[in-house]
Amino acid sequence: MKVFIILGALNAMMAVGTGAFGAHGLEGKLSDKYMSIWEKATTYQMYHGLGLLVIGLISGTTSINVNWAGWLLFFGIVFFSGSLYFLALTQVRILGAITPIGGVLFIIGWLVLVIATLKFAG
């Protein structure tokens, strides 16, 4: 599905940008703890952006329905990485409760991809 290729590419692009911003723009402005949180958000955004690219490519060439997996990964990025970026910049922990929701969405998204692939292969 074209939307997942676009979302994947945009998220990978944003991960490169946020990584560069963290390394150059935030250096010395955030404590090591919050820099580590920023880097984790960037890393997970990149991994799952690449996952979205793969889902977009798979959905365009087979009959596997991976749309649910794609949307779960996308919203996982929003909740997980988004809340970590916010936490790193503001040190406001209230949105920290949202981070695990994003992690669960990632896990379910990958599981849905496995199940869809097994159904197709089976």
Curated annotation (Swiss-Prot):
From the record, give the transmembrane residue ranges: 3-23, 46-66, 69-89, 98-118
Q: Where in the cell is it found?
A: Cell membrane
Give the superkingdom in one word: Bacteria
Instruction: Give an example GO cellular component term for this record.
Output: plasma membrane
Do you know which Pfam families this protein is assigned to?
DUF423 (PF04241)
Give the UniProt keywords, A-Z. Answer: Cell membrane, Membrane, Transmembrane, Transmembrane helix
Classify the protein's membrane topology as the record does. Multi-pass membrane protein
Q: PANTHER family, from UniProt?
A: TRANSMEMBRANE PROTEIN 256
Family as reported in the entry's similarity comment? Belongs to the UPF0382 family.
Please identify the protein, giving its name as recorded: UPF0382 membrane protein SERP0230
